[in-house]
Amino acid sequence: SVCRILEGCWNYSFIMGSKYGGTRSGTQWNQSFWSKEKASNFARKKDISELDYLEVDQNLLPWDDQADGAIQDAQDDVREILKRPILNLQGMSNADIKLNYGIANFEILSACDQNYTRLIRALNQWGEALYQSEKLADAESIFSYALDIGSDISSTYITLGKIYAQTDRIEQIQPLIERVKKQDFFMRDTVIDKLTGIVRSYQ
């Protein structure tokens, strides 16, 4: 997935920076990284049948057979993704996956993780399309479900906050902010600022 590619780029830049910077902490990190990476490439295959694969109750999603345009496209994307095995491995590095489940399972688990990333993106696109069409209740159900399965997409949080404000439920934004504070993703502080701004604008 994109996350896996970015991880590799980050690891490379960190290692190169450590190499030419000559810091002790960088050298230690470099040694630790390669030691873990080497060990992971010899990890034995393990049973992955009992992992917490995502099972989506499709009755929770506001399907609309009469939809067209962006809404229909997003629905179709979600339907297609739900035909595949989905697993949220956010927070695990490539080496972590191989060490925990064996290098022989790495390709299939990476695909499952990529399916998860595709799903939360498709759900966000679906929710945004519904929001733009002023179908706020349906958009809210999509965004809420996406967060329940662990989405870290910033616009999922922010647009849900906008819906709360537009439907005079501003008090529900603070719990949403507290939820964001417990997460660890790149745009966390930006999301908190945006949600706080929505509250201030409402008052």
Map each language-model feature to its residues:
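N-terminal alpha-helical interaction modules that lie
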Residues: 2-120, 201-203
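Residue at a conserved register position within TPR or TPR-like alpha-solenoid repeats
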Residues: 129-130, 164, 199
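TPR alpha-solenoid repeat register
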Residues: 155-156, 189-191
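TPR repeat positional signature
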Residues: 122-123, 157
